[in-house]
Amino acid sequence: MLSGKTVKLIVFELLQFACLCIPVFVVMERFASVIRFVKSSDTAYWLVVAASVAYAASVTLFVWVPLKYFMLKTQRFSEVTNWRPVTLAYVILSTLPCFAIIIASSKVQADAAIRFDRLTELPVSLVLFSLICVDIVERIRPLRLTGKASGLDLDLEMPGPVLTHLEQVTSISGHLQANGQDGDASFRSPVSNGSLSGRWEDARTYGLPRTSSSAYLYSHSHSGPFSFLWKRDPRHDLFVSSFMFWLDTVEMVRVAGTNSVFYSGWVFPIYILAYLSLLRVVITPDSPLLALSSILSQDLPFLVVRICLLAVFGYVTPVLYILKNILASISFVYFVFMTKLKLLNRGSMF
């Protein structure tokens, strides 16, 4: 009888394989329908369908299966920590050709002066949903699917802080200076090799100097008649965060599906920039590079394109997303770069 880990592995691999092939088949079939309508020929339709089957078979045999073999058997990519080979292969082998076919469909219909199919509902949604599913599988693969969440980050995950006590705390360095001792020489952190993550290091070390400030003590509240509402699971948060992470790109692709935009030249830069933003899925979720890549590949380019679309086509995109791109870009530049300036790096300001 198969073990739970084996069943989990089989389910994950089948799901990722389905996400690899199904979007290609659906998009190519819709494109074949456009070709049949333009050329009035069933032969062209079946040629496109056959090409999609041949492409999926070739990619599976020569790229996808060898990649999975190297990852699962030889552990060739076991030391890769900042990027994910599976998601990189997916966005190249599945998402890229799907976006290219959608752009080609727009071009074919625009040249033929017809408006047959904008591929807005099922094809585009399926491509983005498959990408999100692959991302979720890669993120949830190390976690258990049954029982309580395990692991250091999951065990230390706080369902929600509750302010239970407030008091004035004098810093450790202040006590040492009062006794004529050097705080930096006497107190040192017991963690020297970075074995603890940054967000928990302050809670587990005692030698970190702090200024005199209010100390907030937190506790978990599980009692009372509404204790059943005080629940949270990191695995559920993973699903929600994965969808929320791509909402901006989803909205940009939705704008490309409107009649006025899809049959114009603006569909090219929109889908190209949307694909560049999708490349962020290659970076691991906890990588420091993710924040900068989000600004450079999504917020700044999307801001420029949305302002141009607003000027050319009117309110085809909500102003809310423009404000989001502006605030995300400004806050990143300010907190990451400008706060390091001497003028803004003073403890007495704000």
Swiss-Prot record:
Keywords: Membrane, Transmembrane, Transmembrane helix. Its main location: membrane. The keyword Membrane applies. InterPro entries: Uncharacterised_FAM23-like_TM. GO terms for cellular component: membrane. The keyword Transmembrane helix applies. It is a multi-pass membrane protein. The chain crosses the membrane at residues 9-29, 47-67, 85-105, 120-140, 259-279, 302-322, 325-345. It comes from the Eukaryota. Coiled coil: none annotated. It is found in: Membrane. Belongs to the TMEM236 family. This is Transmembrane protein 236. It comes from Danio rerio.
